Structures are given as C-alpha cells and as structure tokens.
A protein has these predicted regions:
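Non-catalytic accessory regions
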Residues: 1-73
Length: 73
C-alpha cells in the first residue's frame, strides 16, 4: 500500500476515534505535500498533528496500535 494511503488511513482513523477533525487531517496532509514538494522531505501525518498541537503522543500511539491490530487480522 502506498505511503499516502497509509497517511490517509492514519488520519481518518484518528478522526474516527475523535482525536482530530477531518479538516485538521486534510490540513496536515496539505502541509505534508507542500513540504515534500518544497524540500523533498516527508514528515508523518502524526508528527505534523503533534507539532501543531492537535494530537498527543499517547493519542498517536493509540491510533498506531489500532492500525497494527487491523493489519494482523
């Protein structure tokens, strides 16, 4: 699965879990794409949301745990 699909899945799940809004997810993806184009860097959506104060590290880890559990099914 592509990296972008993984990022969208993370963001959608975080929104579904009530940690962020869909608007915050879309803005984080926009930041990610702009940085990738401008600087050739790729920051994870979770790190962008953390740095912008929209998620805590505990929330990020909770989302990642659920994603991992779903992958193992």
């Amino acid at each position: 699965m592509s990296e972008l699909n993984n990022e969208v899945r993370f963001g959608k799940l975080a929104a579904d879990m009530g940690f962020i809004t869909m608007d915050q997810m879309l803005k984080a993806i926009e930041v990610q794409v702009k940085e990738n184009i401008a600087f050739g860097t790729h920051r994870k959506i979770g790190m962008i949301l953390l740095e912008e104060g929209h998620m805590t590290m505990d929330q990020i880890n909770e989302v990642l745990k659920v994603l991992e559990e779903r992958r193992s099914l």
